[in-house]
């Protein structure tokens, strides 16, 4: 519930609609529910809560090149989310802090191509077998880039 409190505290700093992407699986479901309650109680109409099912299906959206669909490139939602970060960095839509831990998390996770030619990130269980901790910070960045095309990130901060 720390995330819910932080979202409510930080909310007034921003203008326009505020998109809060939450991994809605497991513990995140409670955060999503509580934020929805507070949004209704406090009449926070600018807050848009986006539940993301990291275990769900990859969207059928057309990618930036207009030729391929995300579901034809990425095997699962987590791989797709990480792909949105890669795309945003390549297009210079976002930049990351010089954070050694974050860089390590983004660069230590292996990937492979499936028999259907789709990209698949190494699972957290496979990472653990290699002695690597869960890439929680990288996952948070990936989650924050989800649906990046629905709004201009620069319009949110004063």
Task: For each feature predicted by the language model, list its residue ranges.
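Acidic two-metal-ion nuclease catalytic site recognized across multiple nuclease folds
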Residues: 102-103, 107-158
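Mg2+-dependent endonuclease catalytic cores in nucleic-acid-processing enzymes, primarily RNase H-like
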Residues: 1-117
């Amino acid at each position: 519930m720390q995330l819910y409190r932080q979202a409510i505290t930080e909310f007034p700093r921003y203008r326009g609609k505020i998109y809060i992407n939450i991994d809605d699986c497991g513990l995140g479901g409670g955060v999503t529910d509580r934020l929805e309650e507070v949004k209704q109680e406090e009449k926070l109409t600018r807050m848009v809560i986006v539940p993301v099912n990291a275990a769900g299906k990859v969207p059928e959206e057309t990618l930036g090149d207009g030729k391929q669909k995300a579901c034809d490139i990425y095997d699962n939602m987590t791989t797709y989310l990480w792909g949105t970060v890669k795309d945003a960095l390549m297009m210079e839509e976002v930049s990351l802090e010089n954070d050694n831990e974050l860089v390590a998390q983004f660069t230590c996770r292996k990937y492979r191509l499936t028999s259907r030619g789709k990209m698949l990130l190494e699972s957290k269980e496979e990472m653990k077998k290699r002695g690597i901790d869960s890439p929680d910070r990288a996952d948070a960045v990936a989650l924050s880039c989800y649906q990046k095309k629905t709004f201009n990130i620069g319009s949110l901060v004063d």
